[in-house]
Amino acid sequence: MARIFTQSLLSTAAVIMIATTSACSSGGGNGIPTPPAPAPAPAPTPTPTPTPTPTPTPTPAPTPAPAPSPTPTPTPTPPASSFDTAEYRATAGAVSANALAAYQRGALGTGIKVGVIDSGIDLQSAEFGSRVDPASTSTAGNATIDDESGHGTAVAFTLAGRRNNTGTHGIAFDATLLIFRTDNPGSCTVSTGDNSGCKHDDRSIATALDLARTNNARVVNVSLGGSPASPVLVQAIDRATRAGIVIVISAGNDGTANPDSFAAIATNAAVSRGLVIIAGSVGTNDVISSFSNNAGTGANFFLSAVGEQVRAPNQENVPFLWSGTSFSAPQISGALALLAQAFPTLTGTQLVEILYSSARDAGAAGIDAVYGRGILDLTRAFAPIGQTSLAGSAVPVSLTSNGVLSSAMGDARQTGLGTVILDSFSRAYTLDLARTIGTARQQPALVGALTGRLRHFSAAVGSTAIAVTIAPGRDQASVERLRLSPGDAEQARTIAATITSRLGSRAAFAFGFSQSAAAMGAQLAGRSDPAFLIAQTPEQALGFASNPMTAMALRRDMGGFGLTLATEQGAVLAPVSNPLLAQRSGWQRLGYDRVAIALDRRFSGLSTVLTATHLREQDSLLGAHFGAGLGAVQAASWFVDAAARLEAGGGWSIGAAYRRGWTFAHTRTGFSGSGLVGSEAFAADIGKNGIFSGHDSFGVRIAQPLRVTSGSGLDLQLPSYFDYSTGAVSRYDSQRLNLAPTGRELDLEMRYAVPFQGGMIQTNLYMRRDPGNVATLADDYGLALRYSLGF
């Protein structure tokens, strides 16, 4: 059974001689696809004839090419930037496929054998040099593999033509070629009659496939077409695919809805095993070529690549512009060679699946009857595909977001956290985890400080007092976090006293919902702080966004001292690292619990309190959340707080508070890592009651919210080397995750309150420097004016 080329011998294909006498050569690559540099003006494309015709003789006949220059001595792989050359940009197939992504990784096809079953190769050409494998041979009885038609040479060049900054180059310009000449002796020289043009017998093709298999070819290119494969060829294809070899077959150039009958072998799963790719042709505009057979019944196995106006030399080393699916096939074969070199452990099935899953979609969405799987795209093929994981583990890693710092860490800068990750095909990539760590989103301070339309209720029944804050909603009232108005400050003492009376003369107990243990402890001790909105004291909050859920406090008087034990459970409101989820909610709730013990003492007008707190965070570190890709960090903290307030007489009050924290953090997944994180916060204020009247009040406070101290961070043991031969991490390196910010938030706030018409007017003016401990943020200013009326 004889086969013919899927180029000029089919109805719509064309070959055009380039009007130049220079020898055709090769060149290097770039990242963003750009139109190739125009080739010298070609002669007009001849109108295709409706029936198969022999290979046309170029008109005018080409001037003999100059003697080829010697093959240059191989040199080390050039820097990535040098691949973006005029030669690369003139190579239409490489540009369309975005091959620069492969070249920049050092993937040139080096060491990969690709079989080319065709009409041989120009043995005098300098375009291939020593990269024609010695096992190359004719399987049809020809005395040599020297090409007589030009088709085989052009296909081989499109696949692996050298790169030398002249003309164009092959897509895998350093691959090794196993050339199998399969044209029947003398058939390529017949130019007239029904038997004109090269003919290829199935037995010759089958023998070539077997030789490709036994000589370790990873890929075999077959730019031929015709009737269905004979049994002898089917068996050879079966043997090749069983060995894991990928076969690329041209779709055919009849412009029909389905691939050529020969290429349809790809749909025979028992024989092809998914390793036969049908190559369709598109132009550089990603539109299917008019001559190309469409995907049709072979859509699942059909991949498109440039097959129009492909510049390549013929058997006499004269450059032509070739069109046909014969020239889209070697683009795909070359792409497979690039992948095989870059990722040596990939199987044939994986190579094919990568090209399919990474193809640019064209036509109807998904797999369609025109473009099949889509258009070859090496930028996407060389990028991680599917779920990425930390090398040496099954721990998932995001390419964009693995953690978000808390406000205590602000703008902590990373010097680089390079590690090795694997994609779903176990391909190794380097990833700088530092680029996947975000900073806490900054919220306007007044949003959280002002409670809106809230109503406060408090009542006492016997020795028990209850305080509730209700926020009216659309359908029902919801009980929110307890917030006592300034007028309720004295009532808070009543609550403490009431509870104390229930447990005896020296003990008091409190239990609450949506209220912090620290606040209830202060109530039991009878302490009330000035009503500042923004500048808070360290003991008023954890230092990061949180939502207390349940808390209990027990206080006992001991001869001038007060001892308070408090417990609390709640949720850290950690920023959502996923940008899509962040748009919906912005926060994720991560559990915490804390236990505090406080010792207080009053000395005339001076009240003091010393508190020790243990905080355990289930999935966070001082409010920061690190996903599995950063070890799923867990933390336990100890805080020591010291606070004092002096009633200086004449209505004057002076207060100060300081917190020091030590957080012990460790990773739980993927790799080992730990660290000690220091933190601190402070506040100082001065105020006076009775400025202009006997009942107004004024105060000023400066405060630093919780901030991680200099030098704090985590030491992570990250995988740094991956050995493909063993499929394992060969080395881990210690790298520092810095958590100390450069910014330092300082809050300055003034307050004034005055009674008016049975209520209270309260004014707060504040300035926040380096909000959220981020040095680059503009200072935050705000003014709040409130009027509250008691009932």
Which residues does each predicted region cover?
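Protease zymogen maturation seam
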Residues: 25-111, 126-127
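Substrate-binding/access-modulating region of protease and related hydrolase catalytic domains
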Residues: 25-38, 108-109, 182-273, 315-323, ...
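Subtilisin-like serine protease catalytic core
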Residues: 76-80, 100-134, 142-201, 229, ...
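C-terminal subdomain of the subtilisin-like protease fold in secreted/lumenal serine endopeptidases
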Residues: 86-94, 98, 210, 217-221, ...
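Extracellular S/T/G-rich loop segment that most often corresponds to the catalytic His/Ser-adjacent loop
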Residues: 118, 126, 265-337, 341
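Hydrolase catalytic cores
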Residues: 158-159, 180-183, 218, 307-373
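Outer membrane beta-barrel translocator domains of Type V secretion systems
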Residues: 442-645
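Outer membrane beta-barrel transmembrane domains
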Residues: 528-541, 564, 576-589, 596, ...
